[in-house]
């Protein structure tokens, strides 16, 4: 018998918990929930100042924070362009944010698509989730060589984003202080 985890960090925490609370040391195997078949690089130049996110458009994914951060980043980086891939219940809210900020020229809702060959054309991937077990989109983005920005939360982001190496991990906020969160994201985008 054995346990399966999606990341080494989950495995380590599970072992620590068993060692702390039981005399039993289980056999734990890490099997990632996904993989990329090959690394993908752009055939030419990546689109300059291009940002992508891919997610269910759900409240817990906080894509609204990402859109607001791009609006704020545009004040310092007028060339920025943000494409949001995915569908879901928050789509109407995102459309309203885009319209309220007159951002139709640089923030685009792209719907659900096969992104296998899409990531490689962008420069930066944004993640707004504060709880990502593994994050297949993170794996796909890193497999295409994108810089990445996400929150410093266990598992997915900490697995794929190496702070100040291939991107930035935004420190966790105790409360959902939206203005501070949006400002922190915008600062790293710029």
Report each predicted region and the residues it spans.
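C-terminal "capping" alpha-helix adjacent to the active site of nucleotide-linked donor transferases
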Residues: 172-190
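Short alpha-helical donor nucleotide-sugar binding micro-motif in glycosyltransferases
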Residues: 112-113, 117-122
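Aromatic "clamp/platform" in nucleotide-sugar-dependent glycosyltransferases that forms part
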Residues: 130
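Nucleotide-activated donor-binding/catalytic signature segment of Leloir-type glycosyltransferases, i.e.
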Residues: 93-112
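Short hydrophobic beta-strand element within catalytic cores of glycosyltransferases
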Residues: 147-151
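Short acidic/histidine- and often glycine-rich active-site loop of Leloir-type glycosyltransferases
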Residues: 153-172
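Conserved donor-binding/catalytic core segment of Leloir-type glycosyltransferases
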Residues: 4, 43-61, 67-70
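Donor nucleotide-sugar binding/catalytic pocket of nucleotide-sugar-dependent glycosyltransferases
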Residues: 2-40
């Amino acid at each position: 018998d054995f346990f399966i985890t999606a990341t080494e960090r989950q495995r380590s925490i599970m072992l620590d918990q068993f060692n702390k609370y039981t005399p039993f040391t289980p056999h734990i195997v890490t099997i990632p929930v996904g993989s990329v078949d090959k690394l993908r690089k752009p055939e030419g130049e990546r689109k300059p100042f291009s940002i992508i996110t891919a997610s269910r458009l759900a409240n817990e994914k906080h894509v609204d924070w990402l859109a607001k951060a791009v609006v704020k980043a545009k004040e310092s980086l007028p060339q920025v362009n943000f494409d949001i891939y995915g569908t879901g219940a928050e789509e109407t809210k995102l459309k309203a944010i885009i319209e309220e900020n007159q951002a139709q020229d640089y923030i685009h809702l792209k719907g659900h698509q096969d992104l296998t060959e899409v990531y490689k054309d962008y420069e930066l991937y944004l993640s707004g989730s504060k709880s990502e077990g593994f994050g297949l989109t993170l794996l796909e983005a890193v497999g295409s060589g994108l810089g990445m920005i996400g929150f410093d939360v266990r598992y997915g982001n900490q697995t794929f984003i190496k702070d100040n190496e291939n991107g930035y991990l935004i420190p966790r906020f105790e409360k959902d202080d939206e203005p501070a969160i949006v400002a922190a994201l915008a600062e790293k985008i710029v």
